[in-house]
Amino acid sequence: NHNPECIVNEPLGTDIVSPPVCGNELLEVGEECDCGTPENCQNECCDAATCKLKSGSQCGHGDCCEQCKFSKSGTECRESMSECDPAEHCSGQCSECPADVFHKNGQPCLDNYGYCYNGNCPIMYHQCYALWGADVYEAEDSCFESNKKGNYYYGYCRKENGKKIPCAPEDVKCGRLYCKDNSPGQNGPC
């Protein structure tokens, strides 16, 4: 798996291959909760000696667990990070927030100026700004024409067997990114 973001994900109980140990603060197979040792447990929903929920408790942890009960259906548990990443809401039936889902890659966003990609709406202005800072914008359309030629160091859309493949006319902005510096004294188109 080439997904480095997974390192920040809390492991599931089924991911742990050692036998369950009550009191180690890892929710493992067969445990309803695990808040550590009885001396250290600060979870009012969990019986630290048995790693079971206390009587009347529905849950002991999770983004959709409030005061030992499942959060109401529709309670926001993960906010929207962009137009392409809608907020997630509790189901009212479990303590965990649903998986983070994104709009389909390629769906138009920002008033059709960009397209969703992995939960973001990357547009060239934002990319230029991130690379170069304020006063830098997407260059004029004519600057992207070299991406159709395929003979420049960066002027192509992809490589196949080491050969640079030029961009189709409708894809010229999928190759090299051209930004324009609009600060005083800079007047070139690209």
From Swiss-Prot:
<feature type="binding site">
    <location>
        <position position="86"/>
    </location>
    <ligand>
        <name>Ca(2+) 2</name>
    </ligand>
</feature>
<feature type="disulfide bond">
    <location>
        <begin position="77"/>
        <end position="97"/>
    </location>
</feature>
<dbReference type="InterPro" id="IPR036436">
    <property type="entry name" value="Disintegrin_dom_sf"/>
</dbReference>
<dbReference type="GO" id="GO:0046872">
    <property type="term" value="F:metal ion binding"/>
</dbReference>
<feature type="binding site">
    <location>
        <position position="31"/>
    </location>
    <ligand>
        <name>Ca(2+) 1</name>
    </ligand>
</feature>
<feature type="short sequence motif" description="D/ECD-tripeptide">
    <location>
        <begin position="83"/>
        <end position="85"/>
    </location>
</feature>
<keyword id="KW-0645">Protease</keyword>
<dbReference type="GO" id="GO:0008237">
    <property type="term" value="F:metallopeptidase activity"/>
</dbReference>
<feature type="binding site">
    <location>
        <position position="21"/>
    </location>
    <ligand>
        <name>Ca(2+) 1</name>
    </ligand>
</feature>
<keyword id="KW-1199">Hemostasis impairing toxin</keyword>
<feature type="propeptide">
    <location>
        <begin position="104"/>
        <end position="190"/>
    </location>
</feature>
<feature type="domain" description="Disintegrin">
    <location>
        <begin position="19"/>
        <end position="105"/>
    </location>
</feature>
<feature type="binding site">
    <location>
        <position position="26"/>
    </location>
    <ligand>
        <name>Ca(2+) 1</name>
    </ligand>
</feature>
<feature type="disulfide bond">
    <location>
        <begin position="59"/>
        <end position="65"/>
    </location>
</feature>
<keyword id="KW-0106">Calcium</keyword>
<dbReference type="GO" id="GO:0090729">
    <property type="term" value="F:toxin activity"/>
</dbReference>
<feature type="binding site">
    <location>
        <position position="100"/>
    </location>
    <ligand>
        <name>Ca(2+) 2</name>
    </ligand>
</feature>
<keyword id="KW-0865">Zymogen</keyword>
<feature type="disulfide bond">
    <location>
        <begin position="35"/>
        <end position="46"/>
    </location>
</feature>
<keyword id="KW-0964">Secreted</keyword>
<feature type="binding site">
    <location>
        <position position="85"/>
    </location>
    <ligand>
        <name>Ca(2+) 2</name>
    </ligand>
</feature>
<comment type="similarity">
    <text>Belongs to the venom metalloproteinase (M12B) family. P-III subfamily.</text>
</comment>
<keyword id="KW-1201">Platelet aggregation inhibiting toxin</keyword>
<dbReference type="Pfam" id="PF08516">
    <property type="entry name" value="ADAM_CR"/>
</dbReference>
<feature type="disulfide bond">
    <location>
        <begin position="33"/>
        <end position="51"/>
    </location>
</feature>
<dbReference type="InterPro" id="IPR001762">
    <property type="entry name" value="Disintegrin_dom"/>
</dbReference>
<dbReference type="InterPro" id="IPR018358">
    <property type="entry name" value="Disintegrin_CS"/>
</dbReference>
<dbReference type="GO" id="GO:0005576">
    <property type="term" value="C:extracellular region"/>
</dbReference>
<feature type="binding site">
    <location>
        <position position="88"/>
    </location>
    <ligand>
        <name>Ca(2+) 2</name>
    </ligand>
</feature>
<feature type="disulfide bond">
    <location>
        <begin position="64"/>
        <end position="90"/>
    </location>
</feature>
<feature type="binding site">
    <location>
        <position position="24"/>
    </location>
    <ligand>
        <name>Ca(2+) 1</name>
    </ligand>
</feature>
<feature type="domain" description="Peptidase M12B">
    <location>
        <begin position="1"/>
        <end position="11"/>
    </location>
</feature>
<feature type="disulfide bond">
    <location>
        <begin position="45"/>
        <end position="68"/>
    </location>
</feature>
<keyword id="KW-0482">Metalloprotease</keyword>
<comment type="subunit">
    <text>Monomer.</text>
</comment>
<keyword id="KW-0862">Zinc</keyword>
<feature type="binding site">
    <location>
        <position position="34"/>
    </location>
    <ligand>
        <name>Ca(2+) 1</name>
    </ligand>
</feature>
<dbReference type="Pfam" id="PF00200">
    <property type="entry name" value="Disintegrin"/>
</dbReference>
<keyword id="KW-0378">Hydrolase</keyword>
<keyword id="KW-0479">Metal-binding</keyword>
<dbReference type="InterPro" id="IPR006586">
    <property type="entry name" value="ADAM_Cys-rich"/>
</dbReference>
<dbReference type="GO" id="GO:0005886">
    <property type="term" value="C:plasma membrane"/>
</dbReference>
